[in-house]
């Protein structure tokens, strides 16, 4: 039996694997789409900060029996506001404020997790993910978050577009640029929550940035970039789950490695931006000029 046949046999036989694959695909789509705006706005570090800063909110939500995604959203928004406040009211620049606050929040989350070791509750899967343990409830939550995020992006596409490429012009036309920024932070927090079970907090930034960065190397048009990023997210999810099942390795890490491989291929072989493509094009141009 070939590996591919074995994978499909397992997929058709076990519902948990079907749920895992569906959840991973959903996460790949929404991470790819929201990641495009993060990349174009130069907010990769902010994306890293928010994805790590939600950890204490998730742990506290577990501790008090509340919904973990509410805790994550609250913590993510508070962190975004705190970063803006510190950078605007001190000599500390935004990148420094991000580094200070997100590491502090992440450290608090680690302390809270280790403090719960004697309670019988294991929250370490939040850090590294375990997509094969996704329940039907988790799947519905992920689907709900995904639909909400995509709906908001569709409804606010024009303000997001203008504030991303020309915030001064957007402000002049009456678009509340600051509110759009915090809306994006809210969506980022939601996407992080959706990705917790799949790749975990440690690796979620890779899924936020890598598919979008890969698409960015292949096109200059935002609609095409959004579609390509979503497609790369889906490919990474499917291939990552496949390698996880076949070779019995961590699913989250497998998904991220596939996404990184796709980026490497685009980096070297992209028709316009690829390093090797530009080298070959330049070499061919020199040969043609030498023979003419």
Curated annotation (Swiss-Prot):
PANTHER family recorded: ABC-TRANSPORTER METAL-BINDING PROTEIN (PTHR30477), IRON TRANSPORT SYSTEM MEMBRANE PROTEIN HI_0360-RELATED (PTHR30477:SF13)
Job description of the protein: This protein is probably a component of a manganese permease, a binding protein-dependent, ATP-driven transport system.
Residue ranges the record marks as coiled coil: none
Biological processes, Gene Ontology terms: monoatomic ion transport; response to zinc ion; transmembrane transport
GO annotations of cellular component type: ATP-binding cassette (ABC) transporter complex
Family note: Belongs to the ABC-3 integral membrane protein family.
Pfam families to which the protein is assigned, alphabetical: ABC-3 (PF00950)
Localization per record: Cell membrane
Keywords for the protein's UniProt record, in alphabetical order: Cell membrane, Ion transport, Membrane, Transmembrane, Transmembrane helix, Transport
Protein name: Manganese transport system membrane protein MntC
Source organism of the structure: Halalkalibacterium halodurans (strain ATCC BAA-125 / DSM 18197 / FERM 7344 / JCM 9153 / C-125)
Transmembrane portions of the chain: 20-40, 58-78, 96-116, 137-157, 168-188, 190-210, 226-246, 249-269
Topology with respect to the bilayer: Multi-pass membrane protein
Record keyword Transmembrane present: yes
